């Protein structure tokens, strides 16, 4: 009985901890980008919905850093070949800004875009087994993009693999627009 009570307590604590370490809002700053197509806007909405529905995102702060308790709001933009991640608390007070160079992920962003285009074209004209082969390649590149993001955020943000994959999707969307 005591074991069960301890287990329930730990589950509640874990759930509360998880609620504090998640993204609850995302804004993609596209003010300096071309107007996105209807398809791009739809992809963004789906990617944001997926990210917000389930994520683990825990910025790493020094101890007793003010206003650092989540959940978090995340603004993503590209400025001067840098990915800019502005992390705010629920009250929308900026608590951390992370700048990452696009250079280390530029190739995988382009590769992912190319294979996505191949996949969309394949759906219209290829057999299911051919489509499945392309989709497996797309998923592998997407996974690699997620792993690269986890490494790039090392010592800045702890996140799970699914969160990194979903962020990679959003970064791809705004990066491709910025490179047009």
What positions do the PLM features span?
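A surface-exposed, charged beta-strand/loop segment in the N-terminal or early-internal portion
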Residues: 63-117
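Generic detection of intrinsically disordered/low-complexity segments and helix-coil linkers/edges
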Residues: 1-4, 106
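Short, surface-exposed linear patches
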Residues: 49, 107-109, 180
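C-terminal charged interaction modules
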Residues: 123-180
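Short, flexible coil/linker segments at or flanking structured domains
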Residues: 14-16, 64, 71-73, 93, ...
């Amino acid at each position: 009985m005591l074991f069960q009570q301890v287990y329930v307590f730990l589950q509640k604590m874990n759930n509360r901890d998880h609620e504090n370490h998640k993204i609850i809002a995302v804004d993609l700053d596209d003010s300096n980008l071309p107007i996105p197509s209807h398809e791009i806007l739809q992809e963004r909405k789906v990617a944001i919905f997926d990210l917000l529905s389930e994520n683990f995102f825990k910025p790493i702060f020094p101890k007793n850093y003010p206003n650092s308790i989540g959940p978090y709001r995340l603004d993503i933009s590209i400025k001067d070949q840098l990915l800019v991640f502005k992390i705010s608390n629920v009250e929308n007070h900026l608590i951390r800004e992370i700048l990452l160079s696009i250079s280390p992920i530029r190739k995988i962003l382009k590769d992912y875009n190319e294979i996505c285009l191949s996949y969309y074209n394949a759906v219209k004209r290829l057999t299911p087994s051919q489509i499945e082969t392309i989709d497996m390649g797309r998923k592998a590149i997407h996974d690699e993009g997620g792993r690269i993001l986890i490494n790039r955020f090392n010592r800045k943000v702890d996140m799970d693999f699914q969160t990194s994959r979903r962020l990679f999707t959003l970064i791809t969307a705004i990066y491709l627009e910025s490179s047009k």
